[in-house]
Amino acid sequence: MLPPAGRIPESRYPGQDKNEDLHGMDDDFLAVGPALRILQLNVESLSPAKRSVISSIADKEKIDITCLQETHVDGDIASRFTITGFDLVSYKLHAKHGRATYVRGNITEAAHVLSTPFCDVIQVGGYHVANVYKPPSERWDSANVLPMLPHPAVFIGDFNSYHPDWGYQTADTDGDQLQNWSSLNDLQLIRDTKQ
């Protein structure tokens, strides 16, 4: 979920060298202003093989932030979170769920801001990024679905909430709550609905 495009300030991209030409990054990407590349993936466990594949994809696609859901890591063991080229900024341990948020190793302006039961928020430069995972069996807090963040902000992840506005046939209670929250906060959903 993103704020309307007109409300994103023109500030320097936090991972960009001031002399780097963003227009020549690759053939299928054209930055028309500040750009931040975010990889989001529900990994359904964070095995060594998956960490290697994630590292390769992130390197090839020049990813700045990686947001993972369903890491299935319940022990606080650093080696189980290592992704080559990235620094772990925040994580939530859980045997069946879990989250992990990383930034590219050369980005120095990154900090953990806050965590709630369903999200971890980091700040990279002037951007706030919320890595969201709500297990299907749990419900949004009707009074406070997700934290409101200053613009520019991105809420990314696996929301496990369904609503016709997002391409689903019907809405569930969580979808109604999330859609109402996003509408009240003037947020737009950019999605690729699971097929």
Where are the predicted features?
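A shared catalytic/ligand-binding motif for oxyanion handling
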Residues: 1-195
